[in-house]
């Protein structure tokens, strides 16, 4: 899709959030939450604001040359 729509100045990118500290994770007990945190080289869960900032940037003119890309935002989880 990114290639098809690029000629129309429409950029298509993907964001892959990792474990984000949301009410959904609040249901986990502390031990499980610590196990999940330990899987992240950065040593913490992500914040929803961090995901929003990346999406905001990708949607802005500052990212006008970014197209067809995937952006994991997971504190290094996939690299681990």
Predicted segments, located by residue:
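A short C-terminal helix-loop "cap" of Rossmann-like NAD(P)-dependent dehydrogenase/epimerase domains
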Residues: 26-40
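Short, flexible catalytic-loop segment of classical short-chain dehydrogenase/reductase
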Residues: 16-27
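A short hydrophobic alpha-helix cap/turn motif
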Residues: 3-7, 20, 46, 59
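Short C-terminal tail/terminal secondary-structure segment
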Residues: 56, 67-80
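Short, small/polar-rich loop/turn modules that mediate ligand/substrate recognition or access, typified
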Residues: 6, 11, 66-68
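A conserved structural motif in NAD(P)-dependent oxidoreductases
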Residues: 40-51, 62
